[in-house]
From Swiss-Prot:
Organism annotation: Zygnema circumcarinatum (Green alga)
Name by which UniProt lists this protein: Cytochrome b6-f complex subunit 6
Membrane-spanning intervals of the chain: 4-24
Encoding gene (name): petL
Known role: Component of the cytochrome b6-f complex, which mediates electron transfer between photosystem II (PSII) and photosystem I (PSI), cyclic electron flow around PSI, and state transitions. PetL is important for photoautotrophic growth as well as for electron transfer efficiency and stability of the cytochrome b6-f complex.
GO CC field: chloroplast thylakoid membrane; cytochrome b6f complex
Family: Belongs to the PetL family.
First-listed, main subcellular location of the protein, grouped into a coarse class: plastid
Superkingdom per UniProt: Eukaryota
Database matches in InterPro entries: Cyt_b6/f_cplx_su6
Topology in the lipid bilayer: Single-pass membrane protein
BP term (GO), one: photosynthesis
Key words of the record: Chloroplast, Electron transport, Membrane, Photosynthesis, Plastid, Thylakoid, Transmembrane, Transmembrane helix, Transport
Protein localization: Plastid, Chloroplast thylakoid membrane
Sections of the chain in a coiled coil: none
């Protein structure tokens, strides 16, 4: 159970990081 929660949290963190990088690149291109 703990392993599944840890894996889900890691996946969520990776997704959040991808969104932040995508938004950052978009803002750089807009400038």
């Amino acid at each position: 159970m703990f392993t599944i929660i840890t894996y889900f949290g890691l996946l969520l963190a990776a997704l959040a990081l991808a969104v932040v990088l995508f938004v950052g690149l978009s803002k750089i291109e807009l400038i």
